[in-house]
Design a protein with these regions (language model features):
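Cofactor-binding active-site loop characterized by glycine-rich and histidine/acidic residues
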Residues: 1-4, 8-105
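Alpha-helix initiation and N-capping motif
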Residues: 4, 19-23, 108, 131, ...
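Short, flexible segments with low predicted structural confidence
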Residues: 33, 109-110, 175-176
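Hydrophobic, small-residue-rich alpha-helical packing segments that form membrane-like cores
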Residues: 55-60, 65-67, 73-85, 92-141, ...
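Long, well-ordered, tryptophan-enriched scaffold segments
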Residues: 114-219
Length: 219
């Protein structure tokens, strides 16, 4: 989901080297709209995050860079936050623990991780491969932790505002349902990296009263 947002947003924000046909070919062989964003394929992608966990580690590096620049040039000039959207797979990789520990050690209060906590991997329920309590894991690594409804924009915004006040890096567990709105596939691995299918799309469109044509972008 994070990677879909990344590719889609490049198109919606006007990058000229990506068009609607590229969007239609998302995650297809030889398509430049790869399943995992890769540096050099399209404009606006600054780093490859395909190996799960690498994006998290890269984000920690960016937060450290901000801290160094802020110390050198002053907070009036350099004072931004680094945000990371992470999935279950990102947190299962070994590289994530090294990055999490480093961020906690240096109290990177300019870093906020939003975890898409849906409990599903491409192989099925997360319990098949992981029993980690992620909240406890981050707490023990010197992070502030928060929880919110990942389908409620106002609650997410409120939780982020609390995280911004912390003097530690922040981890927000956003509880979500993968494939939200799909009556037959929501909450299953059937929507992890796979199309809904024509029949399910038809049902979802009816549920959301969505009468626009496929790939139409309402103004």
């Amino acid at each position: 989901r994070q990677r879909q947002m990344c590719i889609r947003d490049r198109y919606l924000t006007g990058y000229e080297d990506i068009n609607i046909n590229d969007i239609k070919n998302f995650r297809q062989i030889a398509s430049k709209t790869a399943g995992h964003p890769e540096f050099g394929h399209i404009q606006g992608i600054e780093t490859t995050t395909g190996p799960l966990g690498q994006g998290l580690a890269t984000g920690v590096g960016m937060a450290i860079a901000e801290r160094i620049l802020s110390t050198k040039w002053g907070k009036n000039l350099i004072n931004h936050k680094t945000y990371i959207l992470a999935g279950d797979g990102c947190l299962m990789e070994g590289i994530s623990q090294e990055a999490i520990t480093l961020a906690g050690k240096h109290k990177l209060s300019n870093l906020i991780v939003l975890w898409d906590n849906n409990g599903i991997t491409i192989d099925g329920d997360i319990s098949k491969s992981c029993v980690t309590n992620q909240i406890d894991r981050f707490k023990s690594s010197n992070w502030s932790t928060f929880e919110c409804n990942g389908h409620d924009p106002e609650e997410i915004d409120f939780t982020i505002s609390k995280a911004k006040k912390s003097n530690l890096p922040s981890f927000i567990s956003c509880k979500t349902i993968i494939g939200f709105g799909s009556p037959n596939k929501a909450g299953t691995a059937g929507v992890h990296g796979s199309p809904l299918g024509d029949e399910e799309i038809k049902i979802v469109r009816e549920l959301f009263d969505w009468d626009h044509k496929p790939f139409d972008i309402p103004q």
